[in-house]
């Protein structure tokens, strides 16, 4: 069930990015709706705009993937430090008797 929810979140995130990209490029590249088809200039602008946004997205995702292990490690260290009981070492489970 959790896997399906994660897939739905991923799909939702993808669609939000796609819709935002489409809206941004359309507003930038299509100044009027006087013709049914895109003219060559509009088509070139849309191609360039979408390409730039996709390239930017890939670079951001690569940076995220590169930084994620360090972020997870830092969060785990913060969590362990916050949950440690004073006077009890972090390696020792809290519910075990001390001094054994």
UniProtKB/Swiss-Prot annotation:
User: One biological process GO term for this chain?
Assistant: protein transport
Entry GO CC: mitochondrial inner membrane; mitochondrial intermembrane space; mitochondrial intermembrane space protein transporter complex; TIM22 mitochondrial import inner membrane insertion complex
Q: Where is this motif: Twin CX3C motif?
A: 25-49
Q: Where are the transmembrane segments?
A: none
The reply on keyword Metal-binding is yes
Q: Which gene encodes it?
A: Timm10b
**Subunit info?**
Component of the TIM22 complex, which core is composed of TIMM22, associated with TIMM10 (TIMM10A and/or TIMM10B), TIMM9, AGK and TIMM29.
**Domain notes for this protein:** The twin CX3C motif contains 4 conserved Cys residues that form 2 disulfide bonds in the mitochondrial intermembrane space. However, during the transit of TIMM10B from cytoplasm into mitochondrion, the Cys residues probably coordinate zinc, thereby preventing folding and allowing its transfer across mitochondrial outer membrane.
Show the PANTHER family listed in the entry.
MITOCHONDRIAL IMPORT INNER MEMBRANE TRANSLOCASE SUBUNIT TIM9B (PTHR13172)
Q: What is the organism field in this record?
A: Rattus norvegicus
Keywords attached to this Swiss-Prot or TrEMBL record, sorted alphabetically, are: Disulfide bond, Membrane, Metal-binding, Mitochondrion, Mitochondrion inner membrane, Protein transport, Translocation, Transport, Zinc
Membrane: present as a keyword of the record?
yes
* Alphabetical list of SUPFAM superfamilies matching this protein: Tim10-like
Q: Where in the cell is it found?
A: Mitochondrion inner membrane
Protein name, per record:
Mitochondrial import inner membrane translocase subunit Tim10 B
Its biological purpose: Component of the TIM22 complex, a complex that mediates the import and insertion of multi-pass transmembrane proteins into the mitochondrial inner membrane. The TIM22 complex forms a twin-pore translocase that uses the membrane potential as the external driving force. In the TIM22 complex, it may act as a docking point for the soluble 70 kDa complex that guides the target proteins in transit through the aqueous mitochondrial intermembrane space.
One Pfam family in the UniProt entry:
zf-Tim10_DDP
Disulfide cysteine pairs (residue numbers): 25-49, 29-45
């Amino acid at each position: 069930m959790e896997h399906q929810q994660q897939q739905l979140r991923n799909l939702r995130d993808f669609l939000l990015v796609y819709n935002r990209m489409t809206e941004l490029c359309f507003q930038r590249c299509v100044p009027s709706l006087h013709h049914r088809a895109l003219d060559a200039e509009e088509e070139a602008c849309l191609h360039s705009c979408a390409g730039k946004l996709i390239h930017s997205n890939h670079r951001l995702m690569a940076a995220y993937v590169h930084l994620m292990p360090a972020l997870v490690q830092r969060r785990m260290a913060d969590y362990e430090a916050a949950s440690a009981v004073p006077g009890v070492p972090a390696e020792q489970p809290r519910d075990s008797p001390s001094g054994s």
